[in-house]
Amino acid sequence: RSSDLNDEFREYLSEFARSDEYKEMLVQHTVHMICNSGGNVGIERISQELVYSPRYVERVFKEYTGFSPKKMCRLVRAHKALLMLLCSKEFSKTMISLECGYADLSHMNRELKSVLGVTPKMVGREDLYLGSMKTSQTVYNF
């Protein structure tokens, strides 16, 4: 009798794990982990916590969002760096780059340009909001 219950429970869990509801929860948890880490979490860590293979997590995430967890990490980290550059006059650009998880200032500069289309030199300039930041709106359309 208990083996029948175990079999039924396993079947239920197996079906639930394939359901859209479960996949949505997986994506929400992945987004939560990425945002809470400031974009500094790898797919290995995410998949360990979710107890699924990195490939499965990437596939489900991309199916629901249209891009990879790594791309979201890059977006979140670049956005954090941009906000710190805009709001924090007490830290140097090098300090901000390290705080955001970049290897160095040039790494942050390349990522900001690649991901958001801006450079640290552009931050604070009026045309940042009139031109370049318009392109970042399409990036956050998820």
PLM feature segments, named:
Residues L13-L26, H32, S68-V76:
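Short, Lys/Arg-enriched anionic-surface-contact patches
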Residues L13-S19, V31-G42, L83-F91:
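Basic, amphipathic alpha-helical hairpins
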Residues E44-M72, S97-T119:
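Basic/polar phosphate-binding segments, predominantly the helix-turn-helix DNA-binding elements
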Residues A78-K80, I96:
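Basic, Lys/Arg-enriched C-terminal extension of HTH/homeodomain DNA-binding domains
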Residues L86, E111-F142:
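…primarily DNA-binding HTH/wHTH and HhH modules…
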